[in-house]
A protein has these predicted regions:
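Parallel beta-helix/beta-solenoid
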Residues: 40, 45, 67-69, 74, ...
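Bacterial N-terminal signal peptides
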Residues: 7-18
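Positively charged n-region of N-terminal signal peptides that target proteins for export
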Residues: 1-5
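Sec/Tat signal peptide C-region and signal peptidase I cleavage site
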Residues: 20-25
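Extracellular beta-strand/beta-solenoid scaffold signature
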Residues: 29-39, 57-65, 81-92, 111-129, ...
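Leucine-rich solenoid repeat scaffolds
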Residues: 299-345
Length: 345
């Protein structure tokens, strides 16, 4: 597993994207929030509480919240059709709090889905010193997203993510999806979610993750995240994630573990993948990379997880010169606490 390859993959999850959307079927209003030089448009801006149908076809965002509003709740809603974000909570300019519960957020991306690096169903961010974005994402059904299911970014963001069903496309060769991502110093917990079908079969040096905790490589570390009692993948075809849980917090040179403790916890998760579909995660031309749990950090705890299936049966685990398949990969970790995990081929 080459850290630079995976770093470039994970950064793309948040920082890239190339197009601004098709002709509008909704009333799409500029938000003042820019991505990829575009002033993002939204079908709804600071609407307070929302339920029911939100058809955002033609807009960049379905429902947009920022500090100029009073926050709100998205409950029992059906949000679809935007090409960048289904629900976006932007706390850059001040405190913003939104609950997203019992809702369906789907078909977020281009039509058809393609390899441009955007399309996130539920997105929280607070990337300034004075901002915050908080809330709960629970009981939601998230599917048919282009890049990511649920993403929480930056040190001012803190979200509890629990009881959601997040379904990727299965093995696809055009983009490396991630199911749930907490990164760039964000806080939160990820508990009792079901995440399946995040798998990349292309040749561009990438692996997908069911749950990704991302930091380091010159960015803030993401620390103290609890990942507990999630179901990641299943024995059904196309349900596996290339990496069940990826804890990725390298040093500033992106070549090894950081100097500070990351203290992330992966406990009591069921992680399954019966297929070998990744061919480039260990570097283009070198081979694939799949792992039940990947740890790049310091003093992380990997305890009492059940890992099974051909897709995580160890073969050349830790190699950087050929396809590497791991149940638990701590080859780039320091002081990892690995205890009472059950690994079944």
């Amino acid at each position: 597993m080459k850290l630079g390859v995976l770093s470039s993959l994970f950064v793309a999850a948040l920082l890239m994207g190339l197009s601004s959307g098709p002709a509008s079927a909704a009333t799409c209003t500029p938000t003042g929030f820019f991505r990829d030089t575009f002033n993002m448009t939204a079908a709804m801006i600071n609407p307070g509480d929302v339920s029911g149908e939100v058809d955002a076809t033609g807009c960049n965002i379905g429902i947009y919240y920022d500090a100029s509003g009073a926050g709100g709740t998205v409950d029992s809603a059906n949000v679809h059709g935007a090409n960048y974000f289904g629900v976006a909570v932007n706390g850059d300019a001040g405190a913003t709090s939104v609950e997203v519960t019992n809702s369906s957020v789907h078909d977020i991306g281009e039509t058809p889905l393609n390899g441009t690096q955007h399309g996130v169903a539920i997105y929280y961010r607070a990337c300034t010193a004075s901002g915050s974005a908080t809330g709960t994402v629970s009981g939601d059904t998230v599917f048919n997203y282009q890049k990511g299911g649920i993403v929480v970014s930056c040190s001012g963001a803190g979200v509890s993510i629990g009881g959601n069903t997040v379904t990727g496309q299965g093995p696809v060769n055009y983009i490396a999806q991630n199911g749930i991502q907490v990164g760039y110093g964000a806080a939160g917990q990820v508990m009792k979610n079901t995440v399946t079908g995040n798998s990349y079969s292309g040749t561009n040096g990438a692996s997908s993750a069911g749950i990704l905790i991302y930091g380091g490589c010159g960015n803030p570390l993401t620390t103290g995240i609890q990942i507990v009692k999630n179901t990641l993948g299943s024995a059904a075809p196309a349900d596996g994630n290339d990496i069940g849980v990826a804890l990725f917090n390298p040093d500033p040179t992106c070549s090894g573990p950081p100097s500070l403790s990351t203290n992330n916890k992966v406990i009591n998760n069921k992680i399954t993948n019966e297929e070998l579909t990744n061919v480039s995660g260990n570097a283009p031309g070198v081979g694939g990379y799949q792992a039940g749990i990947q740890d790049v950090g310091v003093n992380d705890k990997l305890i009492n997880n059940k890992i099974d299936g051909l897709g995580y049966t160890p073969s050349n685990c830790g190699s950087t010169t050929m396809t590497s398949i791991c149940a638990i990969d701590t080859s780039a970790a320091s002081k990892a606490k690995v205890h009472a995990n059950a690994v079944t081929p």
